[in-house]
Structures are given as C-alpha cells and as structure tokens.
Amino acid sequence: MATSAISTVLGKTSVKNSPSDFSTTCRELNETFASGRTKSIQWRKWQLKQQWWMIDENENEILAALTSDLGRHEMECRSPDILGLKTDILEHIEKIEEWAVTKPIHDAGLLFGRLGKARLLMEPLGVVLIIGVWNFPFLLTIQPSTIRVVTGGPQETSKLLENKFNHIFFTGSAKIARFITAAAAKHLTPTTLELGGQCPAIVTKSANIELAAKRIAAVKFLNAGQICLAVNHVFVDPRVHDEFLSKLEHYMRQSADTGHMCRIINRRNYGRLQDMVNKSEGKVIHCGLGPKGKNSMGPIIVANVSLIDSVMSDELFGPICPVLKDAVSEAITAINSLPRPLALYIFSSDNAETERIQSGTISGGVTLNDVTMHAGVPNAPFGGVGDSGMGYYHGKYGFLGFTHQRTVVEPPTWLDYVMGFRYPPYDMGNLSKLAVPNRLGFRKGETMEDQILGSSRSR
C-alpha cells in the first residue's frame, strides 16, 4: 500500500479510501464488466493510452512523491516506476490484439480440429484486485488495467478481501500472502503471488571477483536493498573470500559516498534491521553513512556468519549483506535448506560449475554473472516458486494470468453416423472403436537406456 505523497498522486486516478465504499466500488466494477463494454480490444487499447498520458502528464508529481516518501534519487525513480511502466503500456498496446485473438487448436485432430472447429477464446476474467507494495508503488499497482485505487494498509486490505473478486494479484511477503490466500479461498478466488524471499548469490572460485562485488554492491544500494530481487546474502568460495570481501567493501563505500542512497521506508523496518545487525555474531563492517534524516542506514557487510545467524533469520529487505564462506557443494546444500527464493545469482566462468548449481537448486529465476536481469527479459515469464510466489506475469504471461482460455467446439450434426455407438443401448460389437492402439510402437520391458531423446518414438 502507498505512503502519503504517493497516495495523493495515485488518488488522481479514482480513489476510494473508506471501507464503507469498498462494497459499492466492487459492485460498480462488476456491473461495468457485466455490461460488456470493457471487453472489446478497442476499449482496452484506448484505456492503455489514457494510462500512458496519465503517467506522462503527471511525471514530475510522481517523481516528487517518490522522492518525498522514499528519499530516492531521480534516476532510481525513473528507472522502474516511469520507464518500466511506460514500457509495459507500449508492449500491451502493440501486442494485445495478437494475445487476445481467438486461436484455432491446430493439434485437435480431424474430429475436433478440422470438423469441430475447436478454438480458444481469450476472455478477461473480470474484476481483479491488485495489492501492491510501497517499494515500487506505481510499477506494481498501475499496471495496464481499469483502475479504482484504494490507499492504506492492513485494515483497508482486510476489508477489501471481504468482497469477491475474479482474481487477486499480490506483491509482498510470504507472511501476508498466507492471509491473502486464506481470504481468497473463502470465495475460491485464484491468486498470483509475487513474494521475494532470501535471494542468494554464489561467488565461485572461477568468478570475476571485481565484477561480482561491483554488481552485488549496486543491487544492495538500489532502493537501499528494499527490492524483492535484491541479493539477500552471498556464498563465497573460501579461496576467493578475502578478495571478494575487500572489493565488496570498496564498492559499498563508493556507493555510500555519492549521497544518492535512499532511506529505509519507516521506523519499524529500520528498527527490525538494526536489531538483526545488533544480534549478529558475525563481523559487522559499516561501509559509510546513509542519507541525512530519519530512518537512515548506510551499507553494511556482515562477514563470518552462519545460516543460524540473526541476519539470516528472514528476508533482509535492506542495505545489509551477509557473506558466508562456503564452497559450491556447501552453498547448494544451504540454499536447499531454506525456502525457495525468487532469484538465484551465480557468479562463475566455469560452465560445468554453473550447470551444477542450476540443476542442484530451485528458484523463481536465475541470472548469471549479474543481478536482477532475468526479470527484464522480454517475452519471458517472471514469478516465484514455493515460498517466493505462484503464477507468472510480465507481458503476455501477465495477460494470460488475467485471462480465461475458453475452449469452444462445434461438432457437425452428422457426427452420429460415425459415433452413434455412444448412445444406449450399448452394442459390444462396437468395442473395437474404443481401443487405443500403440501408435508409437514402444515395447514392454524397455529400460531407461532404451529411451531415445529428440524423438516421439522409443525403439
């Protein structure tokens, strides 16, 4: 949910902040959807273009609100919330006809495909509840859709969830997601969850240490590490540990010296982070000062920590970077002992090493020798797995997440001439028509070694 200045800008869309208005709002939106006027491609394109101009004409106010509430530098404000949102809008305007067109089912066979004209209708689900979060409030809430905005916190969210929606999209923590999904279950409402988690980085003995330190320091600096995709902690091979630690400290200090770091969002989260550092048994290395003002925290490295250290007890969501001295085998074991993360970052120049880590772990996505980049791949799904989320979005995959793919088929009326056997009384003489021959020709008694890859047949 949004903070004060951001709430004011978001409220320019169509804001409903009183819980007493929520039922009315949901009813009005459902009535609008039921009228059918929001379903046409023309209407959706028009709405997308209105969103573009809303962002474009209010750009200075958006930037000012993000700076006021989050203390972010203009470059950090523009990159995700302005650039990211405008890019999404353009992609949807350009692609929505292609995504929404009725699609013939080409592999449906003679009966259903050619004769029955089997096809998929791409129909919008209906009224969707999007529960965004404060770290990227515009990018994560004003995604292409028809909007009524509610700003607030847990109380407003709880009241909203008493209403029935056709889909719920939530960005936030796994703890709150459990509450969201429990409320959604009462109405059998499907959900998409983007949750984050403790995203690890692995720096192997073959890594470019300079590059790894520079890029990990940068993502811990961005939005003061308050990003679901930020590196939470780093596993470093003992043979390059000291070199990496030295370079990481260098780049963190360099970033802090710019004065461009934003602050921690509120006093509660600031206190949570300070408490984790104070209780740590690792070596705490302060790498410079944070911004002036309240809730200010500079970059911090915590070295020589274990998995049971206080700074490893939860997703950090701050400018703190625990460093664990572990070789690849130990790092894989440690990663698999924790909830599945939204992202995994592997720094290595050894392809076999990289493949070993990828195949030995599970995560929402993977970026090699960089950070967060997999989330920006065009035409690719983005989402978590396990405790880091469920479902996908971005581009076509977000469109499909809010779409019901409705199968339609038109069997010809003369079909009874060839399928009359389906009606009672049943004639056992037609039993052969229900037999399924082994058209692939595989044999009983085959072993795993007999299986041929790259072919639909097993010989």
Placement of each model-derived feature along the sequence:
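N-terminal Rossmann-like NAD(P)+-binding subdomain of aldehyde/semialdehyde dehydrogenases
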Residues: 2-120
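Conserved C-terminal structural/oligomerization subdomain of aldehyde/semialdehyde dehydrogenase
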Residues: 3-9, 31, 40-43, 145, ...
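ALDH superfamily catalytic-core signature
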Residues: 13, 175-307, 368
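Structural signal for hydrophobic packing residues in well-ordered secondary-structure cores
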Residues: 33, 52-55, 59, 70, ...
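Residue-level signal for inorganic ion chemistry
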Residues: 44, 89, 147, 168, ...
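Rossmann-like NAD(P) dinucleotide-binding subdomain of oxidoreductase/dehydrogenase enzymes
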Residues: 108-211, 449-453, 458-459
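Conserved residues at the C-terminal ends of beta-strands
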Residues: 131, 153, 171, 219, ...
